[in-house]
C-alpha cells in the first residue's frame, strides 16, 4: 500500500496533464523520500487521482522561490506562487520544493 499526498481538487487536471510537476510544502509535510511512490489524492475528499514518484526534494526559503519553482507548479508568474504559498503557509519561511512525475492515472 502506498502513502498518500494530497492536493487541492482544482489542481487535478494540471497534475494529470503534466503541467504541474512539483509541490511546495512546509516542514510538517516534507517527510517524503526521493524515489518514493505515493498515491496522489484530492484534499477535499481523499479520492485517489494518480500515483506519483518523488524525483527530488529541495529545501528552499520563501525568499529563494523563483520563476523555475513557479513554472514547475504550473504557474506563469512568481508573484502568483508566492501569494498562494503565503495563503497556505502564512508564517513559514522554511519550505520544501518536491518534484514528482505521474506514474499511473486512475480512471473512474
Swiss-Prot record:
Coiled coil regions in record: none
Reaction(s) the record says it catalyses: N(4)-acetylcytidine + H2O = cytidine + acetate + H(+); N(4)-acetyl-2'-deoxycytidine + H2O = 2'-deoxycytidine + acetate + H(+); N(4)-acetylcytosine + H2O = cytosine + acetate + H(+)
Keyword Hydrolase: yes
GO cellular component: cytosol
Gene Ontology MF term list: hydrolase activity, acting on carbon-nitrogen (but not peptide) bonds, in linear amidines; N4-acetylcytidine amidohydrolase activity
Keyword field: Hydrolase
Pfam family, one: ASCH
EC numbers: 3.5.1.135
Family classification: Belongs to the N(4)-acetylcytidine amidohydrolase family.
Family matches, as PANTHER family: UCP029143 FAMILY PROTEIN
Protein name per UniProt: N(4)-acetylcytidine amidohydrolase
Species: Moritella marina (Vibrio marinus)
